[in-house]
Curated annotation (Swiss-Prot):
One of its GO terms (molecular function) is glutaminase activity. SUPFAM superfamilies: beta-lactamase/transpeptidase-like (SSF56601). NCBIfam families: Gln_ase, PRK00971.1-1, PRK00971.1-2. Transmembrane segments: none annotated. It holds the Pfam family Glutaminase. Belongs to the glutaminase family. It comes from Sinorhizobium fredii (strain NBRC 101917 / NGR234). The keyword Cell cycle does not apply. This is Glutaminase. Homotetramer. One of its GO terms (biological process) is glutamate biosynthetic process.
């Protein structure tokens, strides 16, 4: 059985991964259907690890903010579970979709109930759920405050240019939301729900901030650096389970096979991954693979899991 790596070894592992991937920087295809994301330099690469013992390790562009996009769905799901508990599962499923993240076909076939909270239709439903009793502006503010609380960092903001860019070009998301509204699956006006959705997807964070924000999922629901209790141990375990099975769109099975860690990707090129009991990891490389997941980010996490023995399926 491979020996578990001590924290002091993690920086060496990160440095090695960065050095080995440097010749491949720029590989993959930057998301071009959101104009602001299409302008991002594909040569960027950053990675950060925050251990449950408080060690912070980073490499490359780990302090450069980027658009976290669908990674934000982990945070809105956590908020929804806090507000509504297990009742949310009447509105959204817990199964992998096997289809593209913005597919309408499956939604029609299944009566407007999204397969899981991490595909676009599912996250739009979650936005509708947590909008109850709020104006869109109030809820957007609450989401930002919640993510700042998780990361213990008041500098996290929404990139309003990205939010505006998505609002102008997000025709497929308008179609998904309108479709669910036609099935009686949304309680609020489509424009209000999507206003929330586009803005939380436009959160800008660094790898270091993102790794800190996900640390509660690695430590049984409580951030060990701040003492902030976020969710119960059982709920943290269940969020991790959903990230493992559904966190990478229709590439989730391959990510579980290669990396073996709960994780959530975004088309901005970021991935937040969790090694339960050990660490939270964030990686950013804008070039995407055919499933819309970071090509080099996925490879970096595969290398990290292999060298640390952190896969949840065993070293």
């Amino acid at each position: 059985m491979p020996e578990q790596k001590a924290p002091q070894d993690l920086q060496l592992i990160l440095d090695d991964i960065y050095r080995e991937l440097t010749p491949r920087l720029g590989e993959g295809k930057v998301a071009d259907y959101i104009p602001q994301l299409a302008r991002v330099n594909p040569q960027h690469f950053g990675m950060a690890i925050v251990t449950t013992g408080g060690e912070v390790h980073r490499v490359g562009d780990a302090e450069v903010p980027f658009s976290i996009q669908s990674i934000s769905k982990v945070f809105t799901l956590t908020l929804a579970l806090g507000k509504h508990g297990e009742n949310i599962w009447h509105r959204v499923g817990r199964e992998p979709s096997g289809s593209a993240f913005n597919s309408i076909v499956q939604l029609e076939h299944e009566g407007g109930k999204p397969r899981n909270p991490f595909i676009n239709a599912g996250a739009i439903t979650i936005s509708d759920l947590i909008l109850a009793g709020h104006t869109p502006k109030e809820l957007i503010g609450e989401i930002v405050r919640f993510v700042r609380y998780l990361a213990d960092d008041e500098n996290i903001v929404i990139d309003h240019e990205v939010a505006r860019s998505e609002t102008v070009t997000g025709f497929r998301n308008f179609a998904l939301a309108s479709f669910m509204r036609s099935f009686g699956r949304l309680d609020h006006p489509v424009e209000h729900v999507l206003g929330v959705y586009f803005h939380h997807c436009a959160l800008a964070m660094t790898c270091s901030q993102l790794a800190k924000a996900g640390l509660f999922l690695a430590a049984g629901g409580t951030n060990p650096l701040t003492g902030h209790s976020v969710v119960s141990r059982q709920r943290a375990r269940r969020i991790n389970a959903l990230m493992l099975t559904c966190g990478h769109y229709d590439g989730s099975g391959d990510f579980a096979y290669r990396v073996g860690l709960p994780g959530k990707s975004g088309v901005g090129g970021g991935i937040m991954a969790v090694a339960p009991g050990k660490a939270s990891i964030a990686v950013w490389s804008p070039g995407l693979n055919e499933n819309g997941n970071s090509l080099l980010g996925s490879l970096a996490l595969e290398m990290l899991a292999a060298r640390t023995g952190w896969s949840v399926f065993g070293p």
